[in-house]
Amino acid sequence: MTKTKGEKINKSAINEVVTRECTIHLAKRVHNIGFKKRAPRAIKEIRKFAEREMGTTDVRIDTRLNKHIWSKGIRSTPFRIRVRLARRRNDDEDSPNKLYTYVTYVPVSTFKNLQTENVESSDD
């Protein structure tokens, strides 16, 4: 999906429900972090990435993603990770946020030539 001259890339409105698949380069985000803080920092960086990418302050991380981050221990986080970011409507009536972002882990064999892409949303 390359951009030709004069073509604009579509950005979704903040208030609509959308699902994207992205690759996060965790190694550069936990570089120069002490060993005992790497996995917790990786979770915080995923949260920050999702917040910036989707424009919602309420970010929820799936347990499979959390287990994958912690699978090699506290100090050896994966170098890259493929995630699916789903912006969803909040069912809770008294919540201050109308939308939240749900981050799930997407297993891939290789990270070569992967780009951010919109996915047809499927409610898991």
UniProtKB/Swiss-Prot annotation:
Phosphotyrosine modifications at: Y102
Database matches in SMART domains: Ribosomal_L31e
Swiss-Prot/TrEMBL keywords: Phosphoprotein, Ribonucleoprotein, Ribosomal protein
UniProt key word Zinc: no
Pfam families named among the record's database cross-references: Ribosomal_L31e
GO MF terms held by the record: structural constituent of ribosome
PROSITE patterns xrefs: RIBOSOMAL_L31E (PS01144)
One GO process term, biological-process aspect: cytoplasmic translation
GO CC terms, sorted: cytosolic large ribosomal subunit; cytosolic ribosome
Gene3D superfamilies, per database record: 3.10.440.10
InterPro entries in the record: Ribosomal_eL31 (IPR000054), Ribosomal_eL31_CS (IPR020052), Ribosomal_eL31_dom_sf (IPR023621)
Ribonucleoprotein is among the record's keywords: yes
PANTHER family, sorted: 60S RIBOSOMAL PROTEIN L31
Protein name (Swiss-Prot/TrEMBL): Large ribosomal subunit protein eL31
